[in-house]
Structures are given as structure tokens and as C-alpha cells.
């Protein structure tokens, strides 16, 4: 089974990503992994931390001579800001006067709930692990999963469809979405220039008012065949697995598959995707069964149906505010303002990149459970045999 875990704190020495269950023989390009980490750091409205960190992954195990070797893959991403925190967050007992307490919890963050759960006197240790800095390690792990999927002709990309009250009013093509990854300068990750300009104005408004702003990103899995996931068991349904994966990201408060939200207010005849059959296999398709639209988001009955898999994540505004909301001090219980920690104003494009990683890891897990294989060659034999089967159906 393809699994991953992460370790590390926001201002600790480094972050660790551990990926296990990866078949042997999968090519790993370190430049590709580092490019994914770079993409996560981009976007208009990011904070000062992104000017400090220049994330790169150092492979500790599991990859030799540019390929996976079947053993767990460990990666380390250095926190360059660590040098400023060595006395604040020492491993050994340190000078208490240098500790930087989070004395008043921030509404919307894990501060209060985490301090109550783990019996902390204040929220510093909660912040350190709950921070979205952890998603850096997820992106590194996701880059490994993407490398596997790409060997099978399956690609994963994202774009931003909404920031604040500005929403893109048309459907993006796969070519437009994929092209965003090639840009060397990222604004807000929207494929429509006019819409992106209005999105930027929304971020500027939040900057001027010392506020934060959320939005919606869309992740697309392109090139996947029908048959990933199952209706047979509740915890193996593809939509459920993807929703949990994306929902686990910091600040994501809702997940949508296909036209999930508006479908609830529509008639069935306007929602469901009629089925056709082509005389010849359409270019890029795995079967002759066709759809003229994709309201289902590529998933029916918990199983991929051969169309692009489309997942949207709804991101709340970042909870650290430069004009803090009312809170209460942990030590005195007196009313005060919430703590402020250096933060971003808008992270929707970066969250989309992190969601790509989670979707790739989740999709890769179900794919390996279906086709198996201790090596890439074995996996490809199994996969190619299945593709031939559904082509002939």
C-alpha cells in the first residue's frame, strides 16, 4: 500500500516526508520535486516566510541512481528560518526567558483546541505542528506519487477558480491548466487573465484592510482510466478517499466533486452526463464510451469513469490577522486580542499545489491496490493488460 507521513515543526530544523509502498524502478527527477516545492511557495499575497525559505528536498533513502528501489523514501526539507529559533525551540531544556509563547489563541486556528487537547499552558507547540508549513513535506511526497502516475500517462494539475468574491465564469481546458505549471512567475494561478486581475484586486483590498482572504482551487486528474475505486466498500470509494485527502489540508473547509454543489439545486436531466459510443477509439481515451460533459467530475458510484477527475477545495481565509480578533489570555483568562504570527494574506494557489500532492498520493494508493506490482515493469504489465481489456469492452 502506498502510504506517507510527515514530521517536523514550522520553525524546527527541518521537515521530513516518508513515502512507503512505492514500486522499484520509478524514475525520480530531483529537479521536478524541487520545482513542485517552488510552486507551493508562489502566489500573490504570500508572507515574509516565503522570502526566507528556498525549499529543496534532500533524499535520505529509497532512491538510488535516479530510481526508486522499493524501500521507504525519506526526504528532508531544511527550514532556513531555524537559525532564528534555535534558542526559542531547543530540543533540550533551554532558557525559559527566550521562549516565545503564543499567549492568546487565534480564532479559526488550532491554538485553543490543541492546547486543551494536549494540556499545554499556551499554544506555541500547537502552532508549530498545525501550521501549513507542514504541507511542504506533503508536496515533496506528492511529487514522488506524481512521478509514478506520469509513468502510466496520468497527470495531476490545479488552478484557482475563485478568490474572495471573484469567480472564473468559464470552464478551463486541461491544456490551460497544465500550462500554468510552466510559468516562472505566478500571480494567482487562474487561467483567465482578466479574472486573475480582478482576483488580485480582491487580495489588494485584504492587504489594505489588514485582513485575509480565501477562495477555491480545482485539482484535475487527467488521463486516468475507468475503474479506480469501488462501490463495494465505503472506505474505498474514490470520491470519499479524495475528499478526505483534500479536506485534511490546513484551512480547507469544504470539498466538491464535479458539479457537486450546484447539482443539489438542479434537475437530474440537467446534471447527469449522457453516454455515447464512438466508432473509433477517441484520441487519448481508454474506451469508446463517450460523454459530452463532465458534471460528475469523472467519478460515478465511487469509481473513476474515464473522464477527467475534478476536485475542488474551498479554502477559508487564513486565521492569523494583522488586526486580531478578540481572544482570552491562557494565563490570566483576561480578555485581549489574539496573538499575531507572521503570516500570509492569500494562499489559494499554494493550497492548490498541496492539494495536487494529496490527490496524487490518494489516487496512487488506490491504483496500486488495484494493479499491484513490486516493480514499475510489473505494474505496467498489469496496467496495460487492464487497458487492453477495457478497450475491447
Curated annotation (Swiss-Prot):
FMN binds at residues 129-131, 250-251, 301, 316-320, 342. It holds the Pfam family Chorismate_synt. One of its GO terms (molecular function) is FMN binding. Pathway: Metabolic intermediate biosynthesis; chorismate biosynthesis; chorismate from D-erythrose 4-phosphate and phosphoenolpyruvate: step 7/7. Its cofactor is FMNH2. Its EC number is 4.2.3.5. It comes from the Bacteria. Reduced FMN (FMNH(2)). It catalyses: 5-O-(1-carboxyvinyl)-3-phosphoshikimate = chorismate + phosphate. GO terms for biological process: amino acid biosynthetic process; aromatic amino acid family biosynthetic process; chorismate biosynthetic process. Keywords: Amino-acid biosynthesis, Aromatic amino acid biosynthesis, FAD, Flavoprotein, FMN, Lyase, NADP. One of its GO terms (cellular component) is cytosol. Disulfide bonds: none annotated. NADP(+) binds at residues 40, 46. Homotetramer. PANTHER family: CHORISMATE SYNTHASE (PTHR21085:SF0). This reaction introduces a second double bond into the aromatic ring system. Belongs to the chorismate synthase family. This is Chorismate synthase. It comes from Acidobacterium capsulatum (strain ATCC 51196 / DSM 11244 / BCRC 80197 / JCM 7670 / NBRC 15755 / NCIMB 13165 / 161). The gene is aroC.
Amino acid at each position: 500500500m502506498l502510504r506517507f507521513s510527515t514530521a517536523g515543526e514550522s520553525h524546527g530544523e527541518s521537515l521530513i516526508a516518508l513515502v512507503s509502498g512505492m514500486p522499484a524502478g520509478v524514475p525520480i527527477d530531483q529537479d521536478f520535486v524541487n520545482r513542485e516545492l517552488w510552486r507551493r511557495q508562489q502566489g500573490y499575497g504570500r508572507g515574509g516566510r516565503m522570502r526566507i525559505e528556498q525549499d529543496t528536498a534532500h533524499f535520505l533513502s529509497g532512491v538510488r541512481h535516479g530510481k526508486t528501489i522499493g524501500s521507504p523514501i525519506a526526504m528532508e526539507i531544511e527550514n532556513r528560518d531555524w537559525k532564528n529559533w534555535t534558542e526559542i525551540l531547543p530540543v533540550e531544556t533551554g532558557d525559559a526567558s527566550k521562549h516565545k509563547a503564543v499567549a492568546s489563541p487565534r480564532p479559526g486556528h488550532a491554538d485553543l483546541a490543541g492546547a486543551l487537547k494536549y494540556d499545554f499552558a499556551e499554544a506555541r507547540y500547537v502552532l508549530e505542528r498545525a501550521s501549513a508549513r507542514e504541507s511542504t513535506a506533503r508536496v515533496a511526497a506528492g511529487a514522488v506519487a506524481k512521478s509514478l502516475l506520469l509513468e502510466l500517462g496520468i497527470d495531476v494539475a490545479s488552478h484557482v477558480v475563485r478568490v474572495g468574491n471573484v469567480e472564473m465564469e468559464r470552464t478551463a481546458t486541461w491544456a490551460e491548466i497544465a500550462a500554468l505549471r510552466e510559468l516562472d512567475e505566478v500571480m494567482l494561478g487562474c487561467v483567465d487573465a482578466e479574472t486573475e486581475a480582478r482576483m488580485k484586486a480582491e487580495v489588494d483590498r485584504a492587504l489594505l484592510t489588514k485582513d485575509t482572504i480565501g477562495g477555491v482551487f480545482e485539482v484535475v486528474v487527467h488521463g486516468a482510466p475507468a475503474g479506480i475505486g469501488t462501490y463495494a466498500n465505503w472506505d474505498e470509494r474514490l470520491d470519499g478517499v479524495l475528499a478526505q485527502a483534500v479536506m485534511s489540508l490546513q484551512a480547507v473547509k469544504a470539498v466538491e466533486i464535479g458539479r457537486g454543489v450546484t447539482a443539489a439545486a438542479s434537475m437530474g436531466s440537467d446534471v447527469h452526463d449522457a453516454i455515447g459510443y464512438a466508432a473509433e477509439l477517441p484520441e487519448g481515451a481508454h474506451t469508446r464510451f463517450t460523454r459530452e460533459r463532465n458534471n460528475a467530475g469523472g467519478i460515478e458510484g465511487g469509481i473513476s469513469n474515464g473522464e477527467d477527475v475534478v476536485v475542488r477545495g474551498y479554502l477559508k481565509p487564513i486565521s492569523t490577522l494583522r488586526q486580531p480578533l478578540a481572544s482570552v489570555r491562557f494565563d490570566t483568562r483576561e480578555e485581549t486580542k489574539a496573538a499575531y504570527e507572521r503570516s500570509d494574506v492569500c494562499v489559494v494557489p499554494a493550497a492548490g499545489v498541496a492539494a495536487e500532492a494529496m490527490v496524487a498520493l490518494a489516487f496512487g494508493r488506490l491504483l496500486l491496490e488495484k494493479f499491484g506490482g513490486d516493480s514499475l515493469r510489473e505494474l505496467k504489465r498489469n496496467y496495460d493488460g487492464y487497458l487492453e481489456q477495457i478497450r475491447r469492452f
